[in-house]
Design a protein with these regions (language model features):
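N-terminal pre-domain segments of enzymes
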Residues: 1-19
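Conserved beta-strand hairpin/beta-sheet module of binuclear metal-dependent hydrolase folds
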Residues: 18-72, 200-203, 207-213
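Metallo-beta-lactamase
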Residues: 24, 48-50, 56-58, 113-191, 234-238, 243, ...
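Short, solvent-exposed loop/turn and secondary-structure capping segments
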Residues: 43, 62, 90-92, 114-119, ...
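Active-site metal-binding loops of divalent metal-dependent hydrolases
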Residues: 54-55, 83-84, 109, 213-214
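Hydrophobic or amphipathic alpha-helical targeting/insertion segments
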Residues: 78-134
Length: 250
């Protein structure tokens, strides 16, 4: 590898698709890959921009907003959480807007999952993440980290000190839900994957669906950091729903 890693050729090649890139998706959406472990997605509606997922920290989302501003000056008017893993940078939207007067949509299980994994099972998960995300591997040499599947790293070193900036959802739902957000029709469908509160977010007018279920890697059915088993039969239900949408962008 580029830093002297000895690894399978396919593992090394996978790093290329994780390179930091701000992709345009059609005419009304962007997806920022490689900024952290997760992506940040932005959707343009008639009334402004919808931000989907805000990353691991304030600094991560702030960098995503800087990239967005290279493409549009339209204001962010709403936020959506696809699941509870990447909801800790929302304060960056507040900083940019100068207020917190915007709706945040998400599954009603997000708050409980944040409490559970931040509290009662948090220490076990934190220890397990050291193994799962290769945190102790060197940066160079035979045994250096190549990537961690969904991202180049667990946290982007450029985002230290990783300031927490979660803001709870203001509009929650526990089942299929429809709303008009930023002037666009949005259809939410629960689709448990690596989180029980994952949802597929369908924008029929844009022929686009944002999801946390169709991954570019072998799906992690049993995270070694110590989470519960992720039943692939439930996963298949969500994948079937996504396929049935027949959207151009997903």
């Amino acid at each position: 590898g580029p830093n002297g890693q000895l690894a399978h050729a396919q593992h090394l090649a996978h790093t290329d698709r994780l390179a930091e890139t701000f992709y345009a998706v059609g005419d009304s959406a962007w997806c920022y890959v490689g900024n952290g472990l997760s992506n940040q997605t932005f959707i343009r509606g008639p009334e402004g921009i919808i931000a989907i997922d805000t990353g691991e920290c304030h600094e991560e989302m702030a960098q995503a907003l800087e990239k967005l501003r290279q493409h549009t000056a339209e204001p962010i008017v709403a936020c959506i959480y696809s699941h509870f893993h990447y909801v800790a940078g929302t304060s960056a939207i507040v900083s940019e807007r100068g207020d917190d007067d915007f709706p945040i949509y998400g599954h009603d299980g997000i708050a409980a999952n944040l409490t559970r994994f931040g509290g009662e099972v948090g220490p076990r998960g934190s220890r397990g993440m050291v193994h799962q995300f290769a945190m102790m591997l060197p940066e160079a040499g035979d045994d250096a980290r190549v990537n961690i599947g969904l991202g180049r790293f667990y946290r982007n070193p450029k985002h230290a000190p990783y300031t927490g900036g979660h803001i709870p959802a203001t509009h929650t739902f526990g089942g299929p839900h429809e709303a008009v957000i930023a002037g666009l029709k949005v259809i939410f469908q629960p689709a448990p994957s690596d989180a029980t509160d994952s949802v597929t977010i369908h924008f029929p007018e844009l022929d686009l669906a944002v999801n946390n279920i169709f991954w570019p890697v072998l799906f992690n059915v049993f995270a070694i950091r110590g989470e519960e088993y992720r039943d692939p039969r439930v996963l298949l239900t969500g994948l079937d729903h996504l396929a049935d949408l027949k959207v151009e962008h997903q």
